[in-house]
């Protein structure tokens, strides 16, 4: 009797990978919604102070950068991956947000009339951006862990339940403030 491969193992693996990818995208979006003002402010200052971007109008550069950061929130997963494809092998295990911002600077910001030039290699620009994103992300993850720890002390809440999700959302908003979703002012 022949043993036919039904593909169940592959289907399970594919489903697990897709679920994992969706979870990462959800966490990335939540991080970005709550930390957009801080990312925008720190990134603008650092890129100008480290002379990675030279401009004669820093406000215009800041606005262009903000437009790119907001674009991350609105872009589809396919468009996101397509946009970072030219530099996805820049470093091993890259941060997707840092890659996106790097590519945005290399493709869009460099062509702005108020930007004189962008200095540094692709890798140097990525490393400067990734340092900022990583530092902000570490703070965000610590705050997130504290929130989850607070919820774990409440025995009436079961992870995954609707009450748990509501309590998590309320505690998140109380601790982090309201998500800006693109309005850093």
PLM regions and their residue ranges:
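Charge-biased, low-complexity intrinsically disordered regions
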Residues: 1-24, 30, 37
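Helix-boundary capping/turn motifs
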Residues: 15, 76-77, 142-143
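Extended, amphipathic alpha-helical coiled-coil scaffold segments used for oligomerization/tethering
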Residues: 81, 121-124
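Short acidic, glycine/proline-enriched loop segments that cap or flank alpha-helices
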Residues: 31, 53, 93-97, 113-121, ...
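Long amphipathic alpha-helical segments with strong coiled-coil/leucine-zipper propensity
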Residues: 26-112
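Amphipathic alpha-helical interaction surfaces
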Residues: 49, 71, 75, 107-111, ...
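Alpha-helical oligomerization segments
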Residues: 127, 131-185
